[in-house]
Amino acid sequence: MAESVERLQQRVEELERELAQERSRRALGSGDGGGGRARIEKMSSEVVDSNPYSRLMALKRMGIVSDYEKIRTFTVAIVGVGGVGSVTAEMLTRCGIGKLLLFDYDKVELANMNRLFFQPHQAGLSKVQAAEHTLRNINPDVLFEVHNYNITTVENFEHFMNRISNGGLEEGKPVDLVLSCVDNFEARMTINTACNELGQTWMESGVSENAVSGHIQLIIPGESACFACAPPLVVAANIDEKTLKREGVCAASLPTTMGVVAGILVQNVLKFLLNFGTVSFYLGYNAMQDFFPTMSMKPNPQCDDRNCRKQQKEYKKKVAALPKQEVIQEEGEIIHEDNEWGIELVSEISEEELKKSSGPIPDLPEGIIVAYTVPQKQEDSVPEVTVEDSGESLEDLMAKMKNI
């Protein structure tokens, strides 16, 4: 009880300070949006202590990004403002993104304090409200739109679809990118369903239950595998993830892993939006071996999501409509023009032997090939040996053997 009273007193003091700051700003007529500074209309590369964008604009001078100011024209929606999502939102805010849409239904708890960003005095507030308050103070140039609800319910799903398709920097325009920073399969599938239906590009992220590995994945509907194309093992095995949760047992959580995953996620977002570097379709992280595997996955033609299959057909039509570029094959340079000794390269096995050593190739979906085939077992043919009957009796044969 005493802790609750103390927490409420701290919250009252915080609100009183905010009120005093707001009254002071209005009295001075500064017109700033929070954070103790006026809004900056245009990014500048001027190197002065009062310019929060000077080091970001230095990327242009160093030839990394051609037009960094373009970042202020983009809108990003973040679903899940927890360990990864809150840090992702903070990084994008510091980078000067144009607009952020935040979706989460949960509240800040003291158990969240190990996952960066949130502060103890914010316990009890909704995560989106606490995040918006902190982020506005960090960068008042960014526009924020927060929604405190669960996107997996039927009524909220329609509103979620509406906001990602109309909540861009210019109202009525779609967002440029959706980031999934949720921690359960149901929410990921909800985002996947919405983005497949709208043809919306999105990035998925996650941290393992033991907190020592994570990943990010870029999903372009029709072009790359969606989340339903290759479901996690726990889902493929028909296991209800709700039954995995036990009372008094929770998943591990490391702020270091959360920070690394959020960092590579935002890095991929910046490369995708500002068109520099190589954008990874899948990038993993294993803290135990410091291993960062990368790969790309083609969509599954037999995906359970009908909108995914529809997007695949549209993507194939788009690719087929592109003008075909003629591939000019360059002849390899001849190292030795003359062959004085008549040397020839001969295969170790003939084509007939190669066919016998290979088995039948199974019928697989497009894009999947077998590494090897199992040859069919052939029964060893034993030549028949016939012996002519000599006509001698068994006693005569035994007598001959004794004389040998």
Swiss-Prot record:
Keywords: ATP-binding, Cytoplasm, Endoplasmic reticulum, Golgi apparatus, Membrane, Metal-binding, Nucleotide-binding, Nucleus, Phosphoprotein, Ubl conjugation pathway, Zinc. It comes from the Eukaryota. Its main location: cytoplasm. One of its GO terms (biological process) is response to endoplasmic reticulum stress. The active site is at 250 (glycyl thioester intermediate). A motif (UFC1-binding sequence (UFC)) lies at residues 389-404. Signal peptide: none annotated. GO terms for molecular function: ATP binding; protein homodimerization activity; UFM1 activating enzyme activity; zinc ion binding. It is found in: Cytoplasm; Nucleus; Endoplasmic reticulum membrane; Golgi apparatus. Pfam families: ThiF. GO terms for cellular component: cytoplasm; cytosol; endoplasmic reticulum membrane; Golgi apparatus; nucleus. Transmembrane segments: none annotated. Zn(2+) binds at residues 226, 229, 303, 308. Homodimer; homodimerization is required for UFM1 activation. Interacts (via UIS motif) with UFM1; binds UFM1 via a trans-binding mechanism in which UFM1 interacts with distinct sites in both subunits of the UBA5 homodimer. Interacts (via C-terminus) with UFC1. Interacts (via UIS motif) with GABARAPL2 and, with lower affinity, with GABARAP and GABARAPL1. The UFC1-binding sequence (UFC) motif mediates interaction with UFC1. Belongs to the ubiquitin-activating E1 family. UBA5 subfamily. This is Ubiquitin-like modifier-activating enzyme 5. It comes from Bos taurus. The lineage of its organism: Eukaryota, Metazoa, Chordata, Craniata, Vertebrata.
